[in-house]
């Protein structure tokens, strides 16, 4: 066992000096460097909550000259309970003449780390770096790494202390030129894509409502819509680290876009289908890759808005020619149930 008794730990400390300097540059498990919250000196290892037994493996210090020992033995605890309570296990790192205590926490969620090239926090302007995705249910080929760019997303939620992000994944061209191209990756059974959203769920303390509401829609209203696309999106819980700091629980989400809805776009087969996004009150933008946007592209939207603001009798007589009324009713009923 890698765990030592208190007497053995005292023997390891004897003759060495305690230090507050960074002694452990990285902690390795199953061949991968673990995420770390550097301010607290806490490393995180995602584990499979469907298995009662602890994962097998050894903690190793990255590089040479440092050895690590567990001062608390996880094997003495029930795994699911240790994860649920967020129990912290002390870890002793020793070199030839100094030592320092760290901690290990076992998580039941996948983990994403975002490390920017400059070390600056992800803000409104696009910034590049590296994303690493750690699976929880496997320790074989369990980490995916990609070049990434990211920026803060959202409307009023941008003012919250905990931000949501849009992440785009890239990989380097094999020509060796250093140029980047989009990198499609599938996470947690969701679609393979290069664009992903990290949803902060800041205003919802339980972190349950948004996920439950989304799952209800996906299993009801989204299935009632004819078409090749999927008129919903998936979200899975993860934990996020940014530049060596723990950022909390997030929702990893697919974006709602032309690919998700399987819409026709500019220059494709007729009729052209449009996806609009409301930016502010009365202000809409056309989503997708368009070389130009004309008044014609907004005619459908403006016709719908005219019916909404017009006479009730005209609305009742004509709205069925413009929208899928049954679908609109499904959406209304869904919103009454979840809001």
Sequence positions of predicted segments:
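ATP-dependent phospho-/nucleotidyl transfer catalytic cores
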Residues: 183, 252, 258-338
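Short polybasic amphipathic segments
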Residues: 10, 24-29, 90-91, 128-135, ...
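A conserved hydrophobic secondary-structure block that centers on an alpha-helix together
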Residues: 187-248, 307-330
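Short loop/turn segments at secondary-structure transitions that flank enzyme active sites
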Residues: 110, 120, 171-173, 204, ...
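Predominantly extracytoplasmic/ectodomain segments of secreted and cell-surface proteins
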Residues: 2-85, 95-105
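Extracellular structured ligand-interaction cores
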Residues: 111, 126-128, 162-164, 193-195, ...
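Conserved NTP-binding catalytic cores of kinases and kinase-like/nucleotidyltransferase enzymes
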Residues: 49-51, 60-65, 72, 81-86, ...
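A sequence-level detector of short linear motifs
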Residues: 35, 143-144, 248
């Amino acid at each position: 066992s890698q765990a030592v008794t208190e007497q053995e730990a005292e023997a390891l400390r004897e003759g060495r000096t305690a230090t507050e300097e960074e002694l452990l540059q990285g902690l390795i498990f199953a061949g991968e460097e673990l995420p770390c919250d550097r301010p607290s000196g806490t490393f995180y290892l995602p584990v499979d909550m469907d298995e009662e037994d602890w994962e097998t493996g050894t903690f190793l210090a990255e590089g040479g000259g440092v050895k690590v020992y567990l001062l608390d033995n996880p094997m003495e605890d029930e795994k699911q309970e240790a994860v649920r309570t967020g129990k912290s296990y002390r870890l002793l790192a020793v070199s030839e003449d100094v030592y320092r205590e760290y901690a290990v926490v076992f998580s039941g969620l996948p983990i994403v780390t975002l490390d920017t090239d400059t070390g600056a926090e992800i803000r409104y302007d696009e910034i590049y770096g590296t994303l690493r995705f750690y699976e929880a249910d496997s320790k074989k080929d369990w980490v995916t790494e990609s070049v990434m760019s990211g920026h803060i997303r959202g409307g009023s939620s941008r003012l919250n202390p905990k931000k949501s992000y849009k992440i785009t994944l890239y990989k380097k061209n094999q020509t060796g030129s250093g140029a980047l191209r989009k990198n499609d990756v599938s996470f947690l059974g969701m679609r393979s894509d290069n664009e992903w959203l990290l949803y902060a769920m800041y205003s919802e303390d339980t972190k349950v409502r948004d996920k439950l509401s989304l799952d209800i829609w996906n299993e009801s209203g989204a299935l009632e819509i004819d078409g090749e696309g999927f008129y919903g999106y998936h979200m899975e819980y993860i934990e996020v680290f940014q530049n060596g700091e723990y950022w909390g629980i997030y929702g990893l989400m697919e974006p709602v876009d032309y690919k998700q809805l399987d819409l026709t776009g500019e220059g494709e087969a007729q009729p052209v289908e449009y996806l609009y996004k409301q930016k502010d009150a009365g202000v809409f933008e056309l989503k997708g890759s368009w070389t130009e946007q004309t008044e014609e592209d907004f005619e459908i939207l403006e016709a719908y808005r005219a019916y909404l603001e017009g006479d009730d009798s005209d609305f009742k007589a004509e709205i069925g020619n413009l929208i899928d009324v049954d679908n609109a009713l499904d959406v209304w009923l869904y919103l009454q149930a979840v809001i």
